[in-house]
Amino acid sequence: MRTLILLGILGATMSAPLIPQRLMSASNSNELLLNLNNAQLQPLQLQGPWIPPFPVILQQRQQQAQIPGLSQFSLANLDWFAGLVPNQRAFPGQVSFAQVTEARQLDPSQPQTSPQTQQGPNYVMPSLLSFKMPPEQGQMLQYYPVYMLLPWEQAQQTAAQSPPQTGQQLFEEQMPFYTELGYVPQQVEPVMPGGQQQPVFDPFLGTAPETAVMTAEVLPYFQKEMIQFKHSNGGIFIPSTSQKPSTTNVFTSTVDPTITPKVMEKKAKTDSLKEP
């Protein structure tokens, strides 16, 4: 049993890739590429390393780097061109802007002509934008904050800046902004020194505001009602324990004078029978 376990561990360690290998693309991993033109199976091909090569490897590959159909360039020159113009690539029929400027600097004796005549119809004329700002203009630019006043804040600001006034002018200046929308608030009149408030007729609404003044006829009525509900036991209602019902008030209030005397006699008899 131990030998089987040791053999399994040994096989796993031997199959593990101890030497760093190059990465393969997802399309090439664990499958073969089928060439449709020749109808033949091709073996796996390793892709180039993802990590950029070291300077020592650069020197070895400078002699081997060749582009089919073009002249031989060294990797150092290609990196230098890529550093100058990182976002432009040379296509057939189009020359990068860095190569055009370099050619003009090397041959200044040639007559300068328009780039459209030198290049093909697909040539895009490069444009230079200078983002550098002169120091004088940079000093003039300053930050100015922008404030936006709301309607109620603007009204408060105008009221604060205006000189102190009294009377109707001060009331007109401090009117809120919702009066413009059609809502007219009722103006509260000051209390008279005599202690009585005079009812004022509102000219806008056409109605007079309600007052709390009570007439002499209404006030005793409320006093009587309050006196009837008041109890001497502090709000505790105790019903009467007498079994004899009081029928005097009932007959006097509900009996119609048009009832005949016979009906009155019958009611009197029934009342006498009910009494113990």
UniProtKB/Swiss-Prot annotation:
Function: Tooth-associated epithelia protein that probably plays a role in odontogenesis, the complex process that results in the initiation and generation of the tooth. May be incorporated in the enamel matrix at the end of mineralization process. Involved in the induction of RHOA activity via interaction with ARHGEF and expression of downstream factors such as ROCK. Plays a role in attachment of the junctional epithelium to the tooth surface.
Sugar-modified residues: 101, 113, 117, 246-248, 252-254, 258, 260, 270, 272
Signal peptide: 1-15
Gene (UniProt): ODAM
Top-rank taxon, per record: Eukaryota
Region Interaction with ARHGEF5, annotated ranges: 125-127
UniProt-recorded name of the protein: Odontogenic ameloblast-associated protein
Modification(s) after translation: O-glycosylated.
Keywords: Biomineralization, Cytoplasm, Glycoprotein, Nucleus, Secreted, Signal
